[in-house]
Swiss-Prot record:
It is linked to Joubert syndrome 15: An autosomal recessive disorder presenting with cerebellar ataxia, oculomotor apraxia, hypotonia, neonatal breathing abnormalities and psychomotor delay. Neuroradiologically, it is characterized by cerebellar vermian hypoplasia/aplasia, thickened and reoriented superior cerebellar peduncles, and an abnormally large interpeduncular fossa, giving the appearance of a molar tooth on transaxial slices (molar tooth sign). Additional variable features include retinal dystrophy, renal disease, liver fibrosis and polydactyly. GO terms for cellular component: centriole; centrosome; ciliary basal body; cilium; cytosol; membrane. The modification Phosphoserine is found at residues 96, 99, 121. Residues 89-137, 275-373 are annotated as: Disordered. Residues 169-266 form the Rhodanese domain. This is Centrosomal protein of 41 kDa. Although it contains a rhodanese domain, does not display phosphatase activity, suggesting that the protein is enzymatically inactive. Keywords: Autism, Autism spectrum disorder, Cell projection, Ciliopathy, Cilium, Cilium biogenesis/degradation, Cytoplasm, Cytoskeleton, Joubert syndrome, Methylation, Phosphoprotein, Protein transport, Transport. The modification Omega-N-methylarginine is found at residue 343. Its main location: cytoplasm.
Amino acid sequence: MSLRRHIGNPEYLMKRIPQNPRYQHIKSRLDTGNSMTKYTEKLEEIKKNYRYKKDELFKRLKVTTFAQLIIQVASLSDQTLEVTAEEIQRLEDNDSAASDPDAETTARTNGKGNPGEQSPSPEQFINNAGAGDSSRSTLQSVISGVGELDLDKGPVKKAEPHTKDKPYPDCPFLLLDVRDRDSYQQCHIVGAYSYPIATLSRTMNPYSNDILEYKNAHGKIIILYDDDERLASQAATTMCERGFENLFMLSGGLKVLAQKFPEGLITGSLPASCQQALPPGSARKRSSPKGPPLPAENKWRFTPEDLKKIEYYLEEEQGPADHPSRLNQANSSGRESKVPGARSAQNLPGGGPASHSNPRSLSSGHLQGKPWK
């Protein structure tokens, strides 16, 4: 009798698919859950980019947490500036409205005030700046150097200083770059102060006024960073031993920061040690040579474009777990449309489920209360 023979060669099932080295660095976007391979990759990344030690005195701050803190501080500062500008405009409008009746009264009395009032004495003119003011030059205006031509020009607006060239007011964190001055001028995080680690070895005045102001202050922290945690860990340990309790070190330094946030947070040209190595066989390796590195700008605040880039990379880093997919959003919207009273209930204040809104608008309510306090 003939035995039953399988159709095809069973060795084809054991044959492995050949891998292309050009696309070896590309990882799958599909989350298949925890695995031993992911665990070993995470351990290798920690050993490569982080320098964890036992019994660390200082606390660590993740790069993503630092980016979220920057977005909150920048949003709160912009809201405060808008409110201040509106208040200034309202006060100017009130002043102009209040000056119109005075001008009409002065024109009606020909600049002499009410007929029944006695003319003030010269001493009253000098002591009281507002006594007997008219469209003509008074004694006080002559003394102070104000003439009729100056009055006709109207109030001169004072030139406001460029607030964007200064650090954020009432900032909850103090960012210190512990590298040398040359490295700081080449590249640093926006809003960081240069504080070389050699400054800690000074016998007299090792700390600046800003550091003393933020030391153990309620609702404020001090953040140290460098390229790869070599200097920052030493400086953080020394400062914690000297009584700093609100000290944090940026985990990974500029090396991890440049990998997760290539744009928006850093000004200047990154050093070669912090730049991510190109994978073998990639097309970018044959690009034209770059020019000389650009120095860092004297930049203290983030522009709206920088904040958009930070938010984009932050969403990419958080992954699809925190952000629902388009399919889930479409299914949820389809379910809401089937319910007849769903949309009407959403329009009522405090009634029905909350609709999907912008995360930036959701965080604005928390910003008013300063969540870092």
